Amino acid sequence: MRPGGERPVEGGACNGRSELELLKLRSAECIDEAAERLGALSRAIWSQPELAYEEHHAHRVLTHFFEREPPAASWAVQPHYQLPTAFRAEWEPPEARAPSATPRPLHLGFLCEYDALPGIGHACGHNLIAEVGAAAALGVRGALEGLPRPPPPVKVVVLGTPAEEDGGGKIDLIEAGAFTNLDVVFMAHPSQENAAYLPDMAEHDVTVKYYGKASHSASYPWEGLNALDAAVLAYNNLSVFRQQMKPTWRVHGIIKNGGVKPNIIPSYSELIYYFRAPSMKELQVLTKKAEDCFRAAALASGCTVEIKGGAHDYYNVLPNKSLWKAYMENGRKLGIEFISEDTMLNGPSGSTDFGNVSFVVPGIHPYFHIGSNALNHTEQYTEAAGSQEAQFYTLRTAKALAMTALDVIFKPELLEGIREDFKLKLQEEQFVNAVE
């Protein structure tokens, strides 16, 4: 180990640049060399949007990309990894493939998303997420392959993770053990700004059904039990409750079913609600209070109520300051202008199943500008995500991720800091590290 805490990189320094800096430049060159193939990959996914768990075309495009990526057979691809539309592609230096290879390779994961939204296609730019993950992995592999001597033991893993928008494919993969051996994970999400981190919130969704009794609305309404009244009461209960909600809590919902005809007392109604909070602990408090509002509406209307939570809760994304600082340092060298840390920590955010990943393995989920001020989940953002202009920003972000991954490989003190940040955040959240 050399004085700066870096592992030596074979090949020497040149023109005053460190060996690691030269390796980072090579990773960026590898991404540029693959730019045409990566852009075609993104366009193929964007042009045929598919909903959660139904991403068969995108899955086929991505697995074929890695199966055919030169040099031949450099990636070991498992095309239907734990889920029908998930995949796993692995690369490691030939020396590390020997049964006697020691020590255990460092496993770095790059995540791809590729599901779309109903009606408006890739309005969240998941085609670009897939491209970033693939490009960053190619950059790391290309840089390490160019070393004249074997690199440190490392395995590059690309995980295709379906169903982020609905269902939580990453949570399914966590439960199947897909993240068990990964040391650090990387992905990036398109947005309106460049942020190394945003405080994505914990989220719980719920379907509420009220059962009443039908009757003629004019002739004998007193014989009925109005399930729509129960739904309206529930909606109003939550509206009143907002006065006591913390400013960081979010509650939003719709009445999905409110009856069939005005002259029939509705015997059935249905609501769908999403609850969000900065932490799982706060989310549990919010959910309990909201469910009390639903039950009170049933009591007042004489109806019965059924409250059913979604298949998975999305956890809040744990920040990893060591990792995001390394990413910002690399990004700035590429010309990325990041929002301030204060704006980053207090800015608006949504929810993602990457939050669940961040509770089992340290990782980074930065956001990147794609050359448009359009807002996510709009038709305008769909257009922007498929534009040629977005390609420059997407590949620049992939380069920053690849460079950060190289820092993790060659700077042991950075990896130590990442792991320490991870443990401290888990302790703050009062969660046990599922990896250990």
UniProtKB/Swiss-Prot annotation:
<comment type="similarity">
    <text>Belongs to the peptidase M20A family.</text>
</comment>
<protein>
    <recommendedName>
        <fullName>Xaa-Arg dipeptidase</fullName>
        <ecNumber>3.4.13.4</ecNumber>
    </recommendedName>
</protein>
<dbReference type="InterPro" id="IPR002933">
    <property type="entry name" value="Peptidase_M20"/>
</dbReference>
<keyword id="KW-0121">Carboxypeptidase</keyword>
<dbReference type="Pfam" id="PF01546">
    <property type="entry name" value="Peptidase_M20"/>
</dbReference>
<dbReference type="GO" id="GO:0042802">
    <property type="term" value="F:identical protein binding"/>
</dbReference>
<dbReference type="Pfam" id="PF07687">
    <property type="entry name" value="M20_dimer"/>
</dbReference>
<dbReference type="GO" id="GO:0005654">
    <property type="term" value="C:nucleoplasm"/>
</dbReference>
<dbReference type="GO" id="GO:0006508">
    <property type="term" value="P:proteolysis"/>
</dbReference>
<dbReference type="GO" id="GO:0004180">
    <property type="term" value="F:carboxypeptidase activity"/>
</dbReference>
<keyword id="KW-0378">Hydrolase</keyword>
<dbReference type="InterPro" id="IPR011650">
    <property type="entry name" value="Peptidase_M20_dimer"/>
</dbReference>
<comment type="function">
    <text>Catalyzes the peptide bond hydrolysis in dipeptides having basic amino acids lysine, ornithine or arginine at C-terminus. Postulated to function in a metabolite repair mechanism by eliminating alternate dipeptide by-products formed during carnosine synthesis.</text>
</comment>
<keyword id="KW-0645">Protease</keyword>
<dbReference type="InterPro" id="IPR052030">
    <property type="entry name" value="Peptidase_M20/M20A_hydrolases"/>
</dbReference>
<dbReference type="GO" id="GO:0016805">
    <property type="term" value="F:dipeptidase activity"/>
</dbReference>
<dbReference type="GO" id="GO:0051246">
    <property type="term" value="P:regulation of protein metabolic process"/>
</dbReference>
<dbReference type="InterPro" id="IPR036264">
    <property type="entry name" value="Bact_exopeptidase_dim_dom"/>
</dbReference>
<dbReference type="InterPro" id="IPR017144">
    <property type="entry name" value="Xaa-Arg_dipeptidase"/>
</dbReference>
